[in-house]
From Swiss-Prot:
Gene designation per UniProt: ruvB
Keyword annotations from UniProtKB, A to Z: ATP-binding, Cytoplasm, DNA damage, DNA recombination, DNA repair, DNA-binding, Hydrolase, Nucleotide-binding
Taxonomic lineage: Bacteria, Pseudomonadati, Myxococcota, Myxococcia, Myxococcales
Name listed for the protein in its UniProt record: Holliday junction branch migration complex subunit RuvB
Enzyme Commission (EC) number: 3.6.4.-
NCBIfam families according to UniProt: PRK00080.1 (NF000868), ruvB (TIGR00635)
Amino acid sequence: MTLKPVREVSPGSQEGEERLEQSLRPATFEEYVGQEKLVENFRVYAKAARARGEALDHVLLSGPPGLGKTSLAHILARELGVALHVTSGPALVKKGDLAGLLTALAPRDILFIDEIHRLSPAVEEALYPAMEDYRFDVVLGAGLGAQTMEMKLERFTLVGATTRTGLLASPLRDRFPIQERLGYYEPTELREIAVRAARKLALPVDPAGAEELARRARGTPRIAIRLLQRARDFAQVEGDGTLTREIVETTLERLEVDGRGLDAMDRRILAVVLDTFGGGPVGIDAVAAAVGEERDTLEDVYEPFLVREGFLARTPRGRVALPPAYAHLGRERPQGKQGSLI
């Protein structure tokens, strides 16, 4: 079996990171950096629900991975003074898995379902009456003799997190009274996140080092923390233990992360579109085959950053390389290449 190398600039969570993320996770709204309007809204929602002694309305958090959706769920539970029960869409295989979680909830508890867009149809359907009427229907028997037994549930809050809102069925999406989308972070916010994390790790940080790390973290706190970990290793072994600009630059050079935050696979994707397919338009399946990746991985992990930074465009005819892609890879743009997005 061939193991793929760990990708330091992947926004998705990687094996073994959960414990560190928990230790660095903000504990309160005051500690949460970025997403100011969203955080202020949740501060009001949580305070009002707690004052009334009610469960918070169901919440849907959407946005790219690594932006703090799980951290928000933890903070909400702490602010409300209730327990947080964590699971994920792929982990809920059958209705019984969901029943076990729902019946264990105390009044006003929060059930957090990550990747909620990956729920099976059967589990999703069973969730509807639980969200609306706080009941779970159990079917006893089969065929014409089947009977439905209704199990009453405590009033709870479902917090769903998704990176792909478009994959949610409308009946599920419409059952969330509170829907908020997290956006990418500014370099100044990522710098503050990196400095706070370094303080918890007892790592001295030079302001220029934190600024350089934040600039290349692709607008994503999870990536900033991951790069900070790797830079800490280089600071300890090849420096004096301080995170300086030179140490950060050395770290990212060794990880093949360039000045725009692109890694080797990002550059390979751009090179394929430019060199193999003449800059496009080219279908995503052709690109996936050329770089040896799954289509879904390209669409969910790699493309969002390349599109956001203006290297690629998604068009009805396929992917098209934009002028910054030619410039970044040092390619001459073919004469007469208009880069039409139509």
